[in-house]
């Protein structure tokens, strides 16, 4: 498979502290990849750097185009969607209005895009006229996913989608992520729960202190490397 996203030698930091140190990886079209690592490993920083939300140096290419000179909005228009940590919805708006507002910048039929999202998330379709604040935590996270999908991204960046959810709700959210991936969208998923992330991602990239220390099919990752990533031993 050809690379949809290519990262080479990516470096980023905050206030003089290095958060990413020469990170290189690729994501193919339609591929789901889990970014795994302990707190502070650089997972969230990597996703933000891809959107231009934090300063970074290195070679970033998406669909053979250079992302470096592009502002965040231009990167989104190129086909990158982003769901940040936490549930980002407008609680006073209906589910449908949350989706339609997210699609305002797209020169397409928003109603068609809304129905496409509802096909992926039947629970949201059943509550389309309800206010977002009435949704469960898992449903709000699904709405966040749906809002990101209104731009029809070819690559979806997810930052800790199960954070703060009960195991049952987290399972529902990851089932939704699986449906997104099955529909052909590439997914780069930052997640602290390796067991949960690997239910949808056949490949994992392991980060420790801002560096890639493992990359490959899940079955190829040794127990020793996993212990180093999560426990430093």
Q: Which residue stretches match the model-derived regions?
A:
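Glycine-rich phosphate-binding loops of nucleotide-dependent enzymes
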Residues: 2-233
